Amino acid sequence: MKPMRNRKQAPSFRKLLKTSKLKLDNKLKNKQFKQESSAKKRRKEQKQLREAVRDVRSKIPKPLETVKKKQPVEEEYEVEEESLPLDMMDEDDVQLMKEMAQRASFLTRDLTYSEPVHANKRKRDDVINKYEKMPRKSKSEPEKEVIHLLPIKDRHGIIPQTMEKPVIPSEEQEENEEEMDTEHTEEVPEEPLRIMTTEELLVHRQVTLEQRKTHIATLASAILSEPENNIRKLKELRSMLMEQDPSVAVTVRKLVMLSLMEVFKDITPSYKIRPLTEAEKAARVKKDTQKLREFEEGLISQYKFYLENLEQILKDWKQMKTKKSEVVSLHAYKGLAEIAVKCLCELMVSLSHFNFHNNIIVLVVPLVNDKCRQISELSMEATRKLFRQDKFGHASLAAVKVISGLVKSRNYDVRPEVLQLLLHLRIKEVEVKKDTEDIAPKQKIMSYKDKKKNLSRMQRKWKKAEEKLERELLEAEASESKEKKLKLNTETLNIVFLTYFRILKRAQKSVLLPSVLEGLAKFAHLINVEFFDDLLIVLHKLIDSGDLTYRESLHCVQTAFNILSGQGDVLNIDPLKFYTHLYKTLYGLHAGATNDDTLIALQCLDVMLTRRRRQVSQQRALAFIKRLSTLALHVLPDSSIGILSTNRVLMQTFPKTDLLLDSDSQGSGIYLPELDEPEYCNAQNSALWELHTLMRHYHPVVQIFAAHLSAGAPSEGSGALKAELSRRSAQELFADYSIKEMTFNPPVSESVPKRKTKSRAFDLSEDLEQLIQAQLEKVSSLHVDFSSCIKAQSV
């Protein structure tokens, strides 16, 4: 008979898929309940075991009971033994009888004794078993006192914690105290330390320093090779900032600071790490995600501690502690502070996107006003780079806030370099880009009705997918919106102008005024129209006061015309006072003064005459061309080139000024060169005779420009300039031919051609030649003695 076939089949995959969710949940709950019950049972057993061990340790073991020996039976039966006829028995029989009497315990025992025969044996066995169960202690192990600590909770439950403390008997404690007293009383002679020579100290320092360098390099290489796995080594590397060996402490700390800076620059991610929420911490994540979280947490903590260490080094240097340190001398704190500032500046520029960037700005920017020149220059250069590289405006806004607070807290008693940093802001570039984008035609956003009317169904589908893709790309690139950029720039400008206006109002005689005027000249086109009238009135008062230097007055003029050339075009204002002031002060430029003011004057002329050509009269243009030609004779060659280039632009902008090239006078009156009013000096009755002198100038480029202007500044023909000169502005030519570095452009040729001169022969009469020869012989034969005359005068 065949065996019965098992008709029960394994459930198919389709059947498994049909399993209800409720059933699966119940299975999961049962499984979890079993796991919890087994864990609870395990915890209960562990608890019972700990309690048993604790009870056994607390009890004092009882000594073993001594078994009482019975009295020999011979004494009890002495009388009976005496009655036996021993003389009739042999010695061997007597000995045998004694042995048999000892073995027959049931005959010789006392019947009145209530205890059973083998009672002592059972009692002895119980005592032995009891002591076998107790834990044994060796003789060498001392007694210990159990101290209960705070319990620990893990996933299995609460685990009690204890600590054992050895108990010292009172006798031993007294003996130890006596031994200590005797040790203190006995004076042990100390061996004097051997004094190392200078060479040995240098060798020891070199060996120690090489060991520290190798250790630093090993740690840094390990961190850079696998940052996520070796993040703990950052702590070990950072701990070397507390080097205690006096011979290498300063050098090692400097090396560690620089090494940590490079390590953080390499391993820092390109995003800002945010703290995790409670829900994110409680949620279960993948192993890789958990590893990344641990790396980010360790990186943030070590980066924070590193910045705190750098800050503490700066504080120690500023306070110049009176407490002498055995490791680092007071003189060495300055070197450590310079390295710390260098690291902070590098981190501020390189990691502008990372955490704690604002904290670094608060530390670095105020150091621009520091007395130490090296530290001030480091922080100044880093702040300049930060302003130039800032694309979104967050870092610039934070730095400007710090500068404004510093100026206000010091009551405007800061160095001018602090405010000059604001000239490197990129706000002007952003605003120019914004204007061009506003002028460009914008794409019209189609509404739903327009799409339905103008596009087919497939086109609408593609349009929707394209818009979705664009949104995703914007989110992926994390691009800042234009509105947000503009908002940040506006807020930054408000703080800058607030600082400038405070100084104009409260500290007009401060050393910061030139920087304020220079900043206003740069950002004047961004000022709100509501402030134009008040600002122009303030500038008028500053010029009329006469307290300004030449450069400050030029900045005032430049600021006023920048205001009027921007949004001020809508204002109907004639800045005649500013034209008159510049015309009057142009002779302040000369070869004996600083050459930097020429660049500001060229910028003012460009804004006043070229950009405002429609508001400039012909008389004013003629007066400025004549005065600039005269000024070109009194300045250095680079300034002459810039001034002649400005004259070229003016002659091309105002064609009727070519009458200055004609010697015939027109109109009434004569030219008044000393008059300070350009409208009434009668410049049309003069001529540019200065060009003939400039054509013989020692600089070849000045000669070229003078000849070009004498020909009427043509754009084509034989008298036209070369392209390399005609396409450049006056400011660019001034910078190209600058003599700041004591160089001559173009270079002077080494060989100078010598002109052949014809020797001229003079025929003298014979009598005259004889007379000259006689006089020469007479003079050579005379004895000249000056000493006698000198002695006579002294007496």
UniProtKB/Swiss-Prot annotation:
Its main location: nucleus. Residues 74-88, 171-181 have a biased composition (Acidic residues). GO terms for molecular function: chromatin binding. It is found in: Nucleus, Nucleolus. It comes from the Eukaryota. GO terms for cellular component: nucleolus. Transmembrane segments: none annotated. One of its GO terms (biological process) is DNA replication initiation. Residues 1-88, 124-144, 168-190 are annotated as: Disordered. Residues 22-39, 46-58 have a biased composition (Basic and acidic residues). Residues 447-492 form a coiled coil. Keywords: Coiled coil, Nucleus. Belongs to the CBF/MAK21 family. This is Nucleolar complex protein 3 homolog. It comes from Xenopus laevis. The gene is noc3l.
